[in-house]
């Protein structure tokens, strides 16, 4: 599939901002199944300084500073990407999950060393006995890792309700686990917490999810969504992606922007401002297919 993606973020401030320094993580990664033919970032007001670099995890970041007084900041990322159906070029090896746990600390290959760092607590994800207990209902003795991961993904999808009104970006997995409600970020954090609590390596993936209008209705510009899902390291195979919000294995409708230990590593836009007072935030995402699009039932949540 080929997509044109427009991600527009608008901050409106009650009072003028005299100086704002920001970091944008809005350019798609290049992967074996994902290529970007065009990617640009439009910023208003025009930044006084602007630099780009790759972070520790390989994500593409843009650092910029706006020094003129402003009551509105608009950051618009435009990308054109080509994505194949699967990031995994082979069938996952049916490795028992316990063997995967033992293999990662002893894997000194570049892939193994990279995976090892995703097995620990991170600023937004703590390891808890209750998470391990929940995970072990799926990770029964000697069960193949891919099968257990699929089962856990389905359980989270069934046991938790999508509800954008009960959480925010700072809600910890412990609270989500109690309330049994949340959004994609919450369910990704929760699944990662469960997996790390049983010593598996799992990372947080941010990106875009294509949505589909109801039958007979036109596609609405700006109605697509930023999204989050989970990637788990399977020794001998590589990274396997799972979307607990929609009970899906990500395919050509999921476009990866970035990955890290948790949301804090891959926030689309963050920074510091001087002034401004209160503010409002509006985000619109448009993911337009540029080639023939198949008909798909259902409306995924994000």
Task: State what each model feature region is.
Residues 154, 186-277:
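Hydrophobic/aromatic-rich core segments of domains that either
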Residues 1, 7, 20-22, 39, ...:
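Structural beta-strand/beta-sheet cores of well-ordered domains, especially the beta-sheet scaffolds
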Residues 93, 158, 168, 172-173, ...:
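Glycine-rich, flexible loop/turn motifs
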Residues 99-182, 263, 278, 285-293:
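Secondary-structure boundary elements
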Residues 1-137, 142:
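Linear, non-domain "peripheral" regions
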Residues 13, 81, 234, 287-289:
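Short beta-strand segments enriched in hydrophobic/aromatic residues
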Residues 250, 266, 274-302:
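Helix-biased "structured C-terminal domain" signature
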């Amino acid at each position: 599939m080929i997509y044109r993606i427009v991600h527009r973020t608008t901050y409106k401030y009650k009072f003028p901002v005299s100086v704002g320094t920001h970091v944008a993580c809005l350019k798609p990664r290049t992967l074996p199944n994902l290529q970007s033919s065009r990617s640009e970032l439009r910023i208003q007001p025009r930044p006084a300084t602007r630099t780009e670099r790759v972070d520790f995890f390989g994500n593409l970041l843009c650092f910029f500073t706006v020094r003129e007084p402003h009551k509105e900041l608009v950051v618009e990322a435009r990308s054109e990407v080509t994505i194949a159906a699967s990031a995994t070029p082979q069938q996952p090896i049916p490795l028992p999950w316990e063997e995967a746990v033992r293999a990662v600390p002893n894997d000194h290959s570049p892939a193994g060393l990279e995976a090892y760092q995703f097995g620990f607590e991170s600023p937004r994800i703590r390891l808890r006995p209750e998470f391990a207990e929940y995970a072990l209902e799926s990770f029964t003795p000697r069960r193949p890792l891919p099968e257990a991961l699929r089962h856990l993904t389905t359980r989270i999808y069934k046991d938790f309700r999508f509800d954008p009104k009960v959480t925010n970006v700072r809600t910890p997995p412990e609270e989500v686990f109690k309330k049994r409600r949340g959004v994609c970020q919450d369910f990704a954090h929760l699944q990662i917490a469960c997996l790390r609590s049983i010593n598996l390596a799992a990372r947080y993936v941010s990106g875009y999810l294509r949505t589909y209008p109801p039958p007979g209705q036109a596609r609405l510009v700006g109605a697509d969504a930023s999204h989050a899902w989970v990637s788990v390291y399977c020794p001998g195979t590589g990274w396997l992606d799972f979307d607990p919000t929609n009970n899906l294995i990500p395919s050509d409708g999921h476009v990866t922007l970035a990955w890290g230990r948790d949301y804090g590593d891959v926030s689309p836009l963050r920074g510091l401002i001087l002034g401004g007072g209160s503010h409002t935030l509006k985000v619109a995402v448009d993911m337009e297919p540029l080639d023939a699009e198949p008909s798909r039932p259902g409306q995924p949540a994000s």
